[in-house]
């Protein structure tokens, strides 16, 4: 699977205090919607990923319902967080 530069940059280092828009698949529009819903930082969205027990289908559905994220972008975000978890947890 080919990944974007944004994906590689995110998974290549600790998350720290990065904005939610640093996650691959989450651009400015989705970032604003997520921020409005209380998910302004990457670690907050990562927390939701963990609360949903790293379940791909649940996380994608949640992103679609919460911020109107398309299935493709939601899968990209899931893959980004999932790979980060594999490397740092």
Swiss-Prot record:
InterPro entries referenced in this protein's UniProt entry, alphabetically: BAF, BAF_prot, BAF_sf
GO BP term (any one): chromosome segregation
Name of protein: Barrier-to-autointegration factor 1
Coiled-coil segments on the chain, per record: none
Primary subcellular site in the record, as a coarse category: nucleus
Keyword set includes Phosphoprotein: yes
Knockout-associated phenotype: Embryonically lethal. Embryos suffer loss of nuclear structure and of a continuous nuclear membrane. baf-1 is delocalized to the chromatin. At permissive temperature (15 degrees Celsius) about 30% of the embryos die, and the survivors appear normal.
Task of the protein: DNA-binding protein which plays an essential role in nuclear envelope formation. Required for normal chromosome segregation during mitosis. Associates with the nuclear lamina via its interaction with LEM domain containing proteins emr-1 and lem-2. In association with lem-3, plays a role in radiation-induced DNA damage repair response.
Intracellular or extracellular location(s): Nucleus
Modification after translation: Phosphorylated by vrk-1. Phosphorylation by vrk-1 in mitosis is essential to achieve correct timing of recruitment of nuclear envelope components during nuclear envelope assembly. Dephosphorylated by protein phosphatase 2A (PP2A) following interaction with lem-4l during mitotic exit, leading to mitotic nuclear envelope reassembly.
Molecular-function GO terms, alphabetical: DNA binding; double-stranded DNA binding; identical protein binding
